Design a protein with these regions (language model features):
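N-terminal targeting signals for export/organelle localization
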Residues: 1-56
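Short, small/polar residue-rich loop motifs at catalytic or cofactor-binding pockets
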Residues: 54-56, 78, 176-178
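A short beta-strand-turn-helix
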Residues: 59-79, 103-106
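Short active-site neighborhood of thiol/selenol oxidoreductases, capturing the structured segment around
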Residues: 72-99
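Hydrophobic beta-strand anchors of alpha/beta hydrolase catalytic cores
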Residues: 80-81, 115, 181
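Structural microenvironment flanking redox-active thiols in thiol-disulfide oxidoreductases
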Residues: 94-154
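Thiol/disulfide oxidoreductase modules built on the thioredoxin-like
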Residues: 150-206
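Short, hydrophobic alpha-helical segments
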Residues: 207-211
């Protein structure tokens, strides 16, 4: 991966209009006056889209194996997108462990679910590191990377915020990022945003519903 330019270590406010609002609301668990016009709960336990639309493509992103991420190839499956990074000390490992438990609750149906863990830290998260990291959680969790620009574009399409902090004296830097999960159904439509602390049983139920 090419090294990020200095300005790329500054603040990145990337918004996807309603998606950004959904992620914030899901993460905070709050209600907004007039929200029923935008959202619907239906049978899902996260914050659902009332009029599902095709999920934005993840152009330029590849799996840790180097294969392009093609959401069209995942039709018939529930797809979860989670943006994070392997050096994350708390939210990412906790969230991936929760996703893994929800997947395991599906039994034989676990093959109908794929989680894309999209790194927002491509300089440190090499494909090899991503593959090792995700393998600790589940074989249904796939590490995804790409150029800094491709990742920023994907984040913008899904309303994901992230910010790379300045490195400390030892070269370490933290990354702030949206901690919610985005759910795509078996028809390739955006359906729901879950907070990272969603109940594992509720998440498993939703994954069955989305296939």
């Amino acid at each position: 991966m090419r090294e990020l330019e200095p300005e790329r270590r500054g603040r990145r406010w990337v918004r996807g209009a309603a998606l950004f609002a959904l992620a914030i609301l899901a993460g905070l668990g709050v209600a907004w006056f007039g929200l029923p016009r935008l959202l619907a709960r239906d049978a899902l336990h996260g914050t659902a889209f009332p009029d599902p639309e095709p999920a934005p493509a993840l152009d330029g992103l590849v799996t840790a194996d180097g294969a392009p991420v093609d959401l069209a190839a995942d039709r018939g499956k529930a797809v979860v997108l989670f943006f994070g990074y392997t050096s994350c000390p708390d939210v990412c490992p906790t969230s991936l462990a929760l996703l893994s438990r929800a997947i395991d609750e599906l039994g034989d149906d676990r093959e109908d679910v794929v989680v894309y863990f999209v790194s927002v830290d491509p300089d440190r998260d090499t494909p090899e590191l991503l593959a090792r990291y995700t393998s600790h959680f589940s074989d249904r969790i796939v590490g995804v990377t790409g150029s800094a620009d491709a990742i920023a574009d994907a984040a913008a399409r899904y309303g994901i915020f992230y910010e790379l902090h300045e490195p400390d004296a030892d070269g370490y830097y933290a990354v702030d990022h949206t901690a919610s999960f985005t759910g795509i159904d078996g028809k390739g439509r955006l359906r729901v945003v879950w907070p990272s602390e969603v109940d594992v049983d509720d998440l498993a139920s939703d994954l069955r519903h989305l296939r």
